[in-house]
Amino acid sequence: MIFSISGDTGGEPDSDNAQIVFNDRVRLNLTTSFTGKDALITGLQAYNFTAGKPITGTGSVAETLFPNDASILGEGMTSFNYEPQFAGFNPQNLQPGCGNNSVCLYKLLYITPVADNFTVFVGPKAEVTDAFPTIVPFASEGQGTLSRAFAINPVLRVSGGTTETGLASAAGFIYKPNDVVDWRALYGSVNAAIPQNEGFPGTPLGAGLFNGSFVAATQLTLYPTENLDLGFNYAYSYHQINILGTGLTGAAAGTLGGLPLTTPVNVNSVGATLTWRINPSIYFTGYGAYFMVDQANGGSAFTDLASWMAGLYFPDAFAEGNTAGLMFGQPLTRVGAGNGATLTPANISNRATPYQIEAFYNYKINNNLSITPGAFVIFNPEGDSNNSTTGVFALRTTFTF
């Protein structure tokens, strides 16, 4: 159970500051085992976040601060780690969805071992992070970093991989031959339950398991020493419309700048993540990610995007059980484009590389309650130097039972 008070300042020159808001997100996860080794995970969720009015209108923090630069799906660099990506509407049909503290099913996943060191999983509502190790020590939505940008490697988010709304159906495997090697892979579809592909706007993501947007992803995790974790990611995804589905930037929609939203795209994504436990009191962590987006309907337009982060994590900071984090990096942004796709779309006044710095402190009151004050500052937000430096602060309270 998460409660947060947050505020934002900055944004586009003529934009309004977002109001100070109070948000909640409540989850109930039920785990059932039939053999003692398997697990059926059922997750219920309610929240009061809003992603704004999809396609037209406003309502999200990103749309308030960046009315021209934010995604038409309410995505932007100011998003929180614990904020559902498509809050309050269903991107499968652009209709209202779960929100306003309605209780909805956000996770349904079955995991079972089938042989020594080999496990399979399948579910109609799942996320990539259900299967892949996050490696970043402050990835926790309730007790880790506040921003969405620095929580996990962005490759894990491609094609709605971690929407926190139960969007994707997925199946895959986990292979752990020894204590050093962990290999996992999955196939996921964000439109598996839809029988007919009507195209945009009726079914913008497609329909069926194999006719529309999908992602095929793999992660190789290595533990070469007791104090070092390494992760290597690759994902291939097809998107029926011109989006990434990461929820990390306004460029996640209309990714091929200058081309229509209805343009389908193929995305090849690569990433690497590490955590080095220097000593019991300080960890170094970081990631790098690169996305190669290509037009999929006969054209040759392309756009490349990149992101990186370096951070320090402090277990038992000032007292046992408390943690702290300090991060700096580049939020996901365009770094190249051509053959008809523009590097600087019309909505960007003066292209510049964005940077973000963030700090948080998680204070553990008892085994069930913690509070996390923190803030992050974005320079050249949404990749536009005409935008004012944007600050986001939050006080998050987390109850765990």
Regions found by a protein language model. Name each.
Residues 54-92, 143-148, 193-209, 240-263, ...:
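Solvent-exposed loop segments that connect transmembrane elements
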Residues 233-264, 271-275, 285-385:
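Outer membrane beta-barrel transmembrane domains
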Residues 63-70, 74-76, 178-186, 271-291, ...:
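Surface-exposed extracellular loop regions of Gram-negative outer-membrane beta-barrel proteins
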